[in-house]
Amino acid sequence: SQTWLAPHQSVVGVSEQVDGSIGPLDISSVRQSEHVDASLTSAEIDSEQRSQLEFDLRHEALTVRRGIIELAHRYSSTPFHIGGACSVADIVSVLLSKVMQVGHRDCEWELRDRLILSKAHTSLALFPALLRAEMISQEDIDRGVFGPDAVLFKHPLRDPQRGFEISGGSLGMGLGYAAGLGLSIRRKDLLSRVFCILGDGECDEGSIWESAAFIGHNQLSNVTVIVDQNRMQLDGPCASILDTGSIARKFDAFGFESVEVDGHDVLALYDALKQQTSRPRAIIAHTIKGKGLSFAENNVSFHDACVTDDLYEQALLDLKVAEEACSC
């Protein structure tokens, strides 16, 4: 394969590229969600609004999972990080549809909230979520994730206008970047928040804890860390590779306020992500690797795998069942 750079692109953060293009991702069957009043938790709205909120959030997550499969299948001979993308789907859906102040949609650009996907190998989950948030266009997706015309990549290139605040690929780097953003935002007296998504395997990296120490020491309350704890990494179960004990307790020790939630309970995620206190927050989201796909759930081989025609058909059946259950 060959690395391609468009004329305006830097070599920094560019992934290995091959030829190819992506067809359109059809999301017309799922309604566009409306932004929810950020001053209210799900428990503070009436039952009808709460049910509608849950319905919207679950459909957003299904849209993301459908987007993951569609994009990966169009490059069926190229492996993608399907498992981690599906485990983080609910998190990015809730963030971008209901929690974050997105610059192009909700506020002045400088006042936007920032999302750092430190586990950048799962960027496939971000594309459909950013499309729904109007940060990227259908044309961007149509140009593909490989080749000289691509503006989206398997490992993202920094492009804040499209929602990519940092180039990705090397694990352990995102939280340090989030720390710098949080400090800069505070010094500018802005109310913006910084959300940083980590993987639990990524938390083996020492740089994560250096950054956590800095954030805790400076009490950067505008920084919220979300750990996608699917308990698996490239080589197997996290506990077998390097058992580091409770991630929540570690963040507590660095001065964070930590909370543990079901990472596929969209209302629990919504409430946890909306809260902001006088301390930085760490949300440990207990998830299932490959969530929503019968062949990929808790299957470490789908850490990085191809979506064949047969798997694609099975995925569509799985998502159809989930869609029907959501509508009941």
Where are these regions (language model features)?
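Glycine-rich beta-alpha junction loops
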Residues: 121-122, 230-231, 265, 287-290
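Intrinsically disordered, low-complexity repeat/linker tracts enriched for polar/charged residues
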Residues: 14-17, 35
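N-terminal amphipathic, basic-rich helices that act as targeting or association modules
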Residues: 30, 41-122
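Generic beta-sheet signal
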Residues: 113-115, 192-196, 223, 278-287
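Glycine/aspartate-rich loop-and-adjacent alpha/beta segment that forms the canonical ThDP
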Residues: 266-328
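Cofactor-binding active-site loop characterized by glycine-rich and histidine/acidic residues
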Residues: 86-210, 216-217
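Thiamine diphosphate
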Residues: 163, 167-275
